[in-house]
Amino acid sequence: MKVLQERIRQEGLILSDTVLKVDSFLNHQVDTELALQIGQEFKKLFGHQPITKVITIEASGIQFAMATAIALGVPFIYAKKKKAVTLSEAVYSAPVHSFTRQEDYLVSVSQKYLGPDDKVLIVDDFLATGAALVGLVDIVKEAGAALLGVGCVIEKSFQEGRSLLENRGIEVHALARIASMSPGEIHFIDNESSLEKIKESAGC
């Protein structure tokens, strides 16, 4: 998605070879027009599938899951982060490790909203290690629903997340695939799987 790559080039802040901040337009302050365009892109990629639900994890994936669900004309669910799940709650849950915050937590989805008849698309903002997405995959599996694919806005392709999901037979699409990055420059993988070196703009 060229417009997304251009925004990352112009406004993204590369703090290290693994840390990219996009909080000025994606996951803190949100460019709503861009978010809706992202939803339309995921519709192009997955719209041929009989999707009944879009699912994500709170909080940074919510706007993109909602935009995608609007484009597809289906509901979306966001898995809630909880320290613990009481036995009285009818939920599906899975443990997730956050490498950013270096903590473990449970993500949960009510059994009222996800079941064996559902055909699910997972949407999230980043694909890196894949830990959070694997948690959602496990929840979909626990619910007996069919997982039709995973869509991520930005992928750090130099990390293991994609292979972790594809090794499970999951279709994965990302709108901006980063091959490598360092302060001052970033390499994107384009649709033809070649590398495009893009210099970060001065002052970003």
Where are these regions (language model features)?
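Active-site-facing substrate-recognition patch
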Residues: M1-I51
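PRPP-dependent phosphoribosyltransferase catalytic core
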Residues: E6, T18, V137-C204
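Conserved PRPP/pyrophosphate-binding segment of the phosphoribosyltransferase/PRPP-pathway fold
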Residues: L36-T100
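A generic local structural motif
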Residues: G39-F42, Q63-F64, L106-V109, G135-I139
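Conserved acidic residues
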Residues: T52, D118, L148
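Short His-Asn-centered micro-motif
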Residues: I57-E58, V123-D124, I154
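Short, glycine/charge-rich flexible loops or terminal/linker lids adjacent to PRPP-binding catalytic cores
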Residues: V74-V120, H187-G203
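Conserved G/P- and acidic residue-centered "switch" motifs that form tight phosphate/ATP-binding loops
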Residues: D125, G130
